[in-house]
Regions:
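Secondary-structure boundary elements
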Residues: 76-84, 146-147, 170-180
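Conserved catalytic cysteine-centered active-site region
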Residues: 23-65, 104-167, 198-204
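Acyl-CoA/ACP chain-elongation machinery
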Residues: 176-204
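Non-transmembrane alpha-helical segments in soluble domains
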Residues: 72-75, 141, 169
Length: 204
């Protein structure tokens, strides 16, 4: 039963676990339905791979989990020992530029904030901040690098990575940073967002 019983409902208990509801007048109902979705393909992580299990993810949105995992993997693949780099570069000489053009739209971010109430759930105080588009940079900084240099994102759909790369290059050229971490992360494969992509004809 809803938390607030409509005024045109008459609710009578019938058993310990069941009630009888009599509705006076017309009533609208939302019923589940099914249809074949136009989009048949989308890039996803391999089945069974959950980056959130590899660090204390605390219900982080999927895109942020991917960011932390990818950043950690990248540091292990640069050909240099990261601790050696840290000993030679001050923490305020490291910059991070990474973002998500779509933002964090799954149930742990903005998506959860937008639909929690109509699903009868509570809106968490984490939904809004974790949905911000620059959060990949903030999370790489906080969870992986711990730097005190420039942190942020430049957004531009498919060109987001290139825009962030430009910011990193400028930091090095201007002497603001000696090490720059650049990237982008998107995790928009949710039913609502896929509807938008389908309408655009962006996916096959």
């Amino acid at each position: 039963l809803p938390a607030v019983i409509p005024s045109d409902w008459v609710v009578t208990p019938s058993t310990v676990t069941h009630v009888h509801v009599k509705i006076v007048g017309q009533q609208e109902f939302l019923l589940p339905t099914h249809r074949e979705f136009e989009v048949k393909a989308a890039g996803q992580l391999p089945t069974g791979f959950d980056p959130g299990t590899l660090y204390p993810s605390r219900n982080h949105p999927r895109g942020l989990q991917m960011s932390v995992y990818a950043a950690s993997d990248a540091l292990g693949s640069i050909g240099l020992d990261w601790e050696t780099v840290r000993r030679h570069v001050a923490i305020d000489q490291m910059s991070v530029y990474a973002g998500s053009a779509m933002g964090q739209l799954d149930g742990a971010g903005t998506g959860g904030m937008l639909k929690a109430r109509y699903l009868g759930q509570r809106v968490s105080a984490k939904f809004c901040p974790l949905g911000f588009a620059e959060m990949p940079a903030d999370f790489v900084n906080a969870y992986v690098l711990g730097s005190l240099g420039g942190t942020g994102a430049s957004l531009g759909a498919c060109a987001s990575f290139l825009y962030n790369l430009r910011l990193g290059i400028e930091d090095i050229r201007q002497g603001r940073a000696r090490v720059v971490f650049v990237g982008a992360a998107e995790a928009p494969v949710t039913p609502e967002i896929m509807e938008g992509y389908a309408a655009m004809g962006a996916l096959a």
